[in-house]
């Protein structure tokens, strides 16, 4: 039967619950545990798909097309054998929607629908379903203890601990142990009060993860244990690390996995973390440095491009290179030519995905620079669409545009997906008036690469599967004139024959793809497309 580890956070947000939980999952997996992870978000949005990247950061897309919290990206990157799906992330909005739909269908037989038991029962059912078929399920609760939005989730966890018993449920709580410079010491009082807040709603943590930017003394560890009713060995010190991939080793060296196995009655071999040691060694000891200029409109919040940032890091690890990302505001680049110096200093240029017209001319300016100056270029999603528009305008000399930016354009080289097949194979009509959450091409889909193309050489295969998140596609009637002018279509979707990628044969490295390869990159091996891109950047840097 599945065993559950619930993860909460206290004192402040952004302590790294997702990374810590994923690191623990990686250690358990290294011991042979079949482990999965789930994120519960207290906000009322049904999913993060239509939320602003400035507020929420990246939307991570799963294989089955769910638009989820960026923490699920961490989960997949730390785990080898468990892929996330729509059952691994749910919000208060989704829970309330499900309960209200049941009420409308009469499933509650006219009873009064309340937070307890109806909302909490729905939360519990989601948690149990997400853990089916696994040895251990790690459940992260978003937000901070004390937030009013989190209370139904906390109550559901309390009930599950009672119902499952000590041998099937544990609570791990992350807290901050701040360092007070004027006093020259770390303070335990915030942690004590955070646990007090938990206990006031009926929850007693079994494990405390104490985050700090300074060393926490053994005396303070004993003090925390004494005043929180947690075993001293279960008070785990987790100081700031040079690399997040050091965290599995940090947790293992403090015997956290042994404690969990003992509590759950699991007799397992020792964890083999040698892969993580190799990752950390390569990351912290690079042999070269390359700079990638990332031109986007959400650059004020790097988390908006979290998976791309990580994919570049992974490629750097693969090539023992320190990949520095120089973020360039696409909107500023439109009118500020002084930013061209950043493009000039870059060893490669990347234009990521995005929505809307704002900043597109700045991105096109960057693409033109990469094409004309033989700088390695990688376009992702919108980065591919704009590469096609740029080439059509400046090489074919036609006034091409996307119908996303100009509904009345005479040359719609990029157009809306107006018809689509759902998972049952039924035709779904989509238009500009449809709900934003229902007009997307989402999830893992197969693509067929043209034999002999650069992309086929990069992947070492002619058939690939990558994840999508977009509404607009390249218009196939422009394929022939583009190819006659030198831009090659190197990949098509397997079923709909939609354009998946383009490249330039007369350019050292110019590849643009409609899909999102960053979602499947791993620190242990990277991703072939990003690996090739960073290698091209290294070659460009060395040839300067």
Swiss-Prot record:
Molecular function per GO: ATP binding; CTP synthase activity; glutaminase activity; identical protein binding; metal ion binding
Regulation: Allosterically activated by GTP, when glutamine is the substrate; GTP has no effect on the reaction when ammonia is the substrate. The allosteric effector GTP functions by stabilizing the protein conformation that binds the tetrahedral intermediate(s) formed during glutamine hydrolysis. Inhibited by the product CTP, via allosteric rather than competitive inhibition.
Protein name, as recorded: CTP synthase
Primary enzyme class: ligase
Species per Swiss-Prot/TrEMBL record: Psychrobacter cryohalolentis (strain ATCC BAA-1226 / DSM 17306 / VKM B-2378 / K5)
Binding site for CTP: 13, 147-149, 187-192, 223
Leftover remarks: CTPSs have evolved a hybrid strategy for distinguishing between UTP and CTP. The overlapping regions of the product feedback inhibitory and substrate sites recognize a common feature in both compounds, the triphosphate moiety. To differentiate isosteric substrate and product pyrimidine rings, an additional pocket far from the expected kinase/ligase catalytic site, specifically recognizes the cytosine and ribose portions of the product inhibitor.
Positions annotated to bind ATP: 14-19, 71
Family per record: Belongs to the CTP synthase family.
Active site residues according to the UniProt entry: 381, 516, 518
Catalysis: reaction(s): UTP + L-glutamine + ATP + H2O = CTP + L-glutamate + ADP + phosphate + 2 H(+); L-glutamine + H2O = L-glutamate + NH4(+); UTP + NH4(+) + ATP = CTP + ADP + phosphate + 2 H(+)
UniProt-annotated binding residues for L-glutamine: 354, 382-385, 404, 471
CDD domains to which the protein is assigned, alphabetical: CTPS_N, GATase1_CTP_Synthase
């Amino acid at each position: 039967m599945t065993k559950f580890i619930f993860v909460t956070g206290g004192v402040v947000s952004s302590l790294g619950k997702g990374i810590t939980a994923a690191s623990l999952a990686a250690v358990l997996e290294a011991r042979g545990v079949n482990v999965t992870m789930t994120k519960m978000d207290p906000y009322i949005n049904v999913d993060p798909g239509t939320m602003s990247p400035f507020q929420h950061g990246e939307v991570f897309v799963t294989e089955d097309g769910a638009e989820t919290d960026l923490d699920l990206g961490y989960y997949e990157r730390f785990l080898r054998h468990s892929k996330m799906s729509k059952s691994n992330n749910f919000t208060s909005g989704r829970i309330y929607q499900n309960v209200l739909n049941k009420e409308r269908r009469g499933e509650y037989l006219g009873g009064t629908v309340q937070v307890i038991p109806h909302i909490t029962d729905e939360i519990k059912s989601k948690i149990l379903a997400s853990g089916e078929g696994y040895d251990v399920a790690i459940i992260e609760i978003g937000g901070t203890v004390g937030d009013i939005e989190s209370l139904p989730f906390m109550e559901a966890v309390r009930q599950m601990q009672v119902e499952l018993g000590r041998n099937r449920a544990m609570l791990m709580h992350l807290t901050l142990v701040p360092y007070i410079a004027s006093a020259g010491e770390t303070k335990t009082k915030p942690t004590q009060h955070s646990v007090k807040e938990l206990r006031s709603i009926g929850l007693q943590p079994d494990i405390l993860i104490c985050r700090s930017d300074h060393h926490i003394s053994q005396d303070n560890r004993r003090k925390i244990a004494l005043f929180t009713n947690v075993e001293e060995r279960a008070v785990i010190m987790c100081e700031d690390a040079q690399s997040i991939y050091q965290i599995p080793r940090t947790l293992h060296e403090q015997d956290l996995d042994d404690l969990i196995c003992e509590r759950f009655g699991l007799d397992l071999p020792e964890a083999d973390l040698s892969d993580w040691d190799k990752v950390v060694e390569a990351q912290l000891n690079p042999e070269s440095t390359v700079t990638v200029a990332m031109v986007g409109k959400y650059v004020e919040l790097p988390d908006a491009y979290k998976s791309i940032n990580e994919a570049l890091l992974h490629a750097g690890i693969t090539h023992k290179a320190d990949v520095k990302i120089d973020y360039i505001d696409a909107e500023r680049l439109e009118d500020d030519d002084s930013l061209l110096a950043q493009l000039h200093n870059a060893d490669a240029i990347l234009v990521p995905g995005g929505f809307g017209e704002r900043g597109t001319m700045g991105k096109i300016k960057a693409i033109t620079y990469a094409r004309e100056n033989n700088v390695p270029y990688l376009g992702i999603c919108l980065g591919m669409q704009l590469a096609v528009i740029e080439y059509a305008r400046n090489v074919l000399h036609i006034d091409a545009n996307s119908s996303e930016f100009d509904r009345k354009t005479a040359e719609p080289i990029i157009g809306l997906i107006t018809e689509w097949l759902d998972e049952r194979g039924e035709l779904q009509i989509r238009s500009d008036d449809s709900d934003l959450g229902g007009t997307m091409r989402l999830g893992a889909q197969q693509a067929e690469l043209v034999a002999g193309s650069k992309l086929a050489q990069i992947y070492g295969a002619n058939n690939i599967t990558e994840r999508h998140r977009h509404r607009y596609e390249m218009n196939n009637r422009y394929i022939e004139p583009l190819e006659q002018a030198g831009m090659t279509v190197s990949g098509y979707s397997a079923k709909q024959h939609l354009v998946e990628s383009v490249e330039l044969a007369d350019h050292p490295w110019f590849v643009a793809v409609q899909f999102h390869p960053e979602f499947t990159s791993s620190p242990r091996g990277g991703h072939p497309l990003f690996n090739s891109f960073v290698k091209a950047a290294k070659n460009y840097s060395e040839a300067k």
